[in-house]
Amino acid sequence: MIVIVALYQFTDLPDVTEVHAKLKNLCTDLKMKGVLLLAAEGINGTVAGTREAIDTFLATLKSDQRFAGIAHKESYADEMPFYRLKVRLKKEIVPLRMPEANPSKMVGTYVEPKDWNALISDPDVILVDTRNDYEVKIGAFKNTINPEIDVFVDFPNYVRENLSEFKHKKIVTFCTGGIRCEKATAFMKLEGFEEVYHLKGGILKYIYSIL
Protein backbone atom coordinates (compact mmCIF):
# COMPACT_ATOMS: atom_id res chain seq x y z
CA MET A 1 0.00 0.00 0.00
CA ILE A 2 1.16 3.51 -0.87
CA VAL A 3 0.33 6.43 1.42
CA ILE A 4 -0.31 9.80 -0.25
CA VAL A 5 -0.01 12.95 1.84
CA ALA A 6 -1.21 16.41 0.84
CA LEU A 7 0.14 19.13 3.11
CA TYR A 8 0.78 22.83 3.48
CA GLN A 9 1.90 25.32 6.10
CA PHE A 10 2.33 29.07 5.96
CA THR A 11 5.33 29.92 8.13
CA ASP A 12 8.33 32.21 7.78
CA LEU A 13 11.35 30.37 6.34
CA PRO A 14 14.30 32.77 6.10
CA ASP A 15 16.49 29.66 5.71
CA VAL A 16 14.34 28.21 2.93
CA THR A 17 17.39 27.18 0.86
CA GLU A 18 18.66 24.98 3.69
CA VAL A 19 15.18 23.56 4.36
CA HIS A 20 14.83 22.76 0.67
CA ALA A 21 18.11 20.84 0.59
CA LYS A 22 17.27 18.92 3.77
CA LEU A 23 13.81 17.85 2.58
CA LYS A 24 15.01 16.95 -0.90
CA ASN A 25 17.68 14.67 0.55
CA LEU A 26 15.20 13.18 3.02
CA CYS A 27 12.57 12.40 0.37
CA THR A 28 15.21 10.96 -1.94
CA ASP A 29 16.59 8.70 0.79
CA LEU A 30 13.05 7.53 1.63
CA LYS A 31 12.33 6.81 -2.06
CA MET A 32 9.30 9.08 -1.98
CA LYS A 33 7.77 10.67 -5.07
CA GLY A 34 5.54 13.67 -5.71
CA VAL A 35 5.93 17.43 -5.56
CA LEU A 36 6.96 19.74 -2.72
CA LEU A 37 7.07 23.52 -3.16
CA LEU A 38 9.08 25.63 -0.73
CA ALA A 39 9.19 29.41 -0.44
CA ALA A 40 10.00 31.97 2.20
CA GLU A 41 6.29 31.86 3.12
CA GLY A 42 6.12 28.10 3.77
CA ILE A 43 5.58 24.67 2.21
CA ASN A 44 2.93 23.10 -0.04
CA GLY A 45 2.75 19.79 -1.84
CA THR A 46 1.67 16.19 -2.26
CA VAL A 47 4.06 13.27 -1.79
CA ALA A 48 3.72 9.52 -1.65
CA GLY A 49 5.63 6.59 -0.24
CA THR A 50 5.41 3.56 2.01
CA ARG A 51 3.80 3.88 5.43
CA GLU A 52 7.23 3.81 7.06
CA ALA A 53 8.60 6.45 4.69
CA ILE A 54 5.67 8.83 5.21
CA ASP A 55 5.81 8.42 8.99
CA THR A 56 9.54 9.18 8.98
CA PHE A 57 9.03 12.15 6.66
CA LEU A 58 6.26 13.68 8.80
CA ALA A 59 8.15 13.08 12.06
CA THR A 60 11.25 14.76 10.65
CA LEU A 61 9.24 17.65 9.24
CA LYS A 62 7.38 18.22 12.51
CA SER A 63 10.61 18.15 14.51
CA ASP A 64 11.08 21.66 13.12
CA GLN A 65 8.79 23.75 15.35
CA ARG A 66 7.73 25.83 12.36
CA PHE A 67 6.01 22.74 10.95
CA ALA A 68 4.84 21.22 14.23
CA GLY A 69 1.18 21.91 13.48
CA ILE A 70 1.27 21.32 9.74
CA ALA A 71 -2.06 20.50 8.12
CA HIS A 72 -2.01 17.25 6.15
CA LYS A 73 -4.49 14.82 4.63
CA GLU A 74 -3.82 11.17 3.84
CA SER A 75 -5.19 8.96 1.09
CA TYR A 76 -4.11 5.55 -0.16
CA ALA A 77 -3.33 3.73 -3.39
CA ASP A 78 -2.27 0.27 -4.47
CA GLU A 79 0.45 1.68 -6.73
CA MET A 80 2.71 4.73 -6.69
CA PRO A 81 0.70 7.58 -8.35
CA PHE A 82 3.75 9.73 -9.21
CA TYR A 83 6.60 9.09 -11.63
CA ARG A 84 9.28 11.23 -9.99
CA LEU A 85 10.18 13.48 -7.07
CA LYS A 86 10.27 17.26 -7.44
CA VAL A 87 11.28 19.49 -4.53
CA ARG A 88 11.33 23.04 -5.80
CA LEU A 89 12.13 26.52 -4.55
CA LYS A 90 9.47 29.09 -5.47
CA LYS A 91 8.66 32.73 -4.73
CA GLU A 92 5.27 31.67 -3.34
CA ILE A 93 3.77 28.30 -2.40
CA VAL A 94 0.45 29.40 -3.90
CA PRO A 95 0.89 32.08 -6.57
CA LEU A 96 -0.91 35.37 -5.94
CA ARG A 97 1.96 37.71 -6.86
CA MET A 98 1.32 39.50 -3.57
CA PRO A 99 4.29 38.60 -1.33
CA GLU A 100 3.09 41.02 1.33
CA ALA A 101 -0.07 38.90 1.75
CA ASN A 102 1.47 36.50 4.26
CA PRO A 103 -0.98 34.34 6.25
CA SER A 104 1.65 33.62 8.90
CA LYS A 105 1.59 37.34 9.76
CA MET A 106 -2.03 38.32 9.15
CA VAL A 107 -4.97 36.18 8.08
CA GLY A 108 -8.75 35.92 8.32
CA THR A 109 -10.65 33.98 10.97
CA TYR A 110 -10.61 30.19 10.59
CA VAL A 111 -14.06 28.58 10.58
CA GLU A 112 -14.32 24.93 11.60
CA PRO A 113 -16.47 22.73 9.31
CA LYS A 114 -18.99 22.15 12.11
CA ASP A 115 -19.64 25.90 12.34
CA TRP A 116 -19.71 26.57 8.59
CA ASN A 117 -23.39 26.01 7.80
CA ALA A 118 -24.52 28.31 10.58
CA LEU A 119 -22.15 31.06 9.45
CA ILE A 120 -23.14 31.04 5.77
CA SER A 121 -26.84 30.92 6.63
CA ASP A 122 -26.52 34.52 7.88
CA PRO A 123 -28.23 36.65 5.18
CA ASP A 124 -25.77 39.49 5.78
CA VAL A 125 -22.74 37.37 4.89
CA ILE A 126 -20.94 37.93 1.58
CA LEU A 127 -19.86 34.43 0.48
CA VAL A 128 -16.96 34.42 -2.00
CA ASP A 129 -15.48 31.38 -3.77
CA THR A 130 -11.72 31.78 -4.26
CA ARG A 131 -11.44 28.89 -6.73
CA ASN A 132 -11.06 29.17 -10.48
CA ASP A 133 -14.15 29.44 -12.65
CA TYR A 134 -14.09 25.85 -13.92
CA GLU A 135 -13.95 24.57 -10.33
CA VAL A 136 -16.86 26.74 -9.22
CA LYS A 137 -19.00 25.43 -12.07
CA ILE A 138 -18.56 21.88 -10.80
CA GLY A 139 -20.35 22.87 -7.60
CA ALA A 140 -20.44 25.47 -4.84
CA PHE A 141 -22.39 26.52 -1.76
CA LYS A 142 -25.73 28.27 -2.24
CA ASN A 143 -25.56 32.06 -2.77
CA THR A 144 -21.83 31.95 -3.54
CA ILE A 145 -20.27 34.79 -5.51
CA ASN A 146 -18.19 33.40 -8.38
CA PRO A 147 -15.35 35.82 -9.27
CA GLU A 148 -15.08 34.03 -12.66
CA ILE A 149 -11.29 34.01 -12.57
CA ASP A 150 -9.18 31.67 -14.68
CA VAL A 151 -6.19 31.71 -12.33
CA PHE A 152 -5.77 32.64 -8.67
CA VAL A 153 -3.46 35.56 -9.47
CA ASP A 154 -6.52 37.35 -10.88
CA PHE A 155 -8.26 37.34 -7.49
CA PRO A 156 -6.76 40.64 -6.18
CA ASN A 157 -7.99 42.56 -9.22
CA TYR A 158 -11.45 41.05 -8.84
CA VAL A 159 -11.60 42.08 -5.19
CA ARG A 160 -10.48 45.63 -5.87
CA GLU A 161 -12.91 46.08 -8.75
CA ASN A 162 -15.97 44.35 -7.30
CA LEU A 163 -15.83 43.98 -3.52
CA SER A 164 -14.38 47.25 -2.21
CA GLU A 165 -17.85 48.49 -1.23
CA PHE A 166 -18.17 45.55 1.17
CA LYS A 167 -15.14 46.32 3.37
CA HIS A 168 -17.40 46.79 6.39
CA LYS A 169 -19.39 43.62 5.70
CA LYS A 170 -18.71 40.08 6.89
CA ILE A 171 -16.79 38.36 4.05
CA VAL A 172 -16.63 34.56 4.08
CA THR A 173 -14.40 32.62 1.67
CA PHE A 174 -13.68 29.00 0.81
CA CYS A 175 -11.58 26.91 -1.57
CA THR A 176 -10.74 23.26 -2.20
CA GLY A 177 -8.15 22.45 0.46
CA GLY A 178 -7.80 25.62 2.52
CA ILE A 179 -4.58 27.10 1.17
CA ARG A 180 -5.98 29.56 -1.38
CA CYS A 181 -8.59 30.99 0.96
CA GLU A 182 -5.93 31.55 3.62
CA LYS A 183 -3.89 33.55 1.12
CA ALA A 184 -7.05 35.32 -0.09
CA THR A 185 -8.04 36.46 3.39
CA ALA A 186 -4.50 37.65 4.11
CA PHE A 187 -4.75 39.82 0.99
CA MET A 188 -8.22 41.09 1.91
CA LYS A 189 -7.07 42.05 5.40
CA LEU A 190 -4.27 44.07 3.80
CA GLU A 191 -6.88 45.77 1.61
CA GLY A 192 -8.80 46.93 4.67
CA PHE A 193 -11.62 44.38 4.87
CA GLU A 194 -12.61 44.33 8.52
CA GLU A 195 -14.30 40.93 8.96
CA VAL A 196 -12.90 38.13 6.84
CA TYR A 197 -13.44 34.41 7.43
CA HIS A 198 -12.42 31.23 5.64
CA LEU A 199 -13.34 27.55 5.82
CA LYS A 200 -10.56 25.72 7.65
CA GLY A 201 -9.26 22.87 5.52
CA GLY A 202 -11.49 23.88 2.62
CA ILE A 203 -14.24 21.89 0.97
CA LEU A 204 -12.33 18.63 1.38
CA LYS A 205 -12.23 18.85 5.18
CA TYR A 206 -15.86 20.01 5.21
CA ILE A 207 -16.94 16.94 3.24
CA TYR A 208 -14.99 14.55 5.47
CA SER A 209 -16.27 16.22 8.64
CA ILE A 210 -19.91 16.93 7.84
CA LEU A 211 -21.18 14.62 5.11
Named regions from a protein language model:
Residues 106-125:
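Internal catalytic-core helix/loop-beta-alpha segment
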Residues 1-109, 131-211:
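Rhodanese-like catalytic fold shared by cysteine-dependent sulfurtransferases
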Residues 126-130:
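Short hydrophobic beta-strand that contains or immediately precedes a catalytic carboxylate
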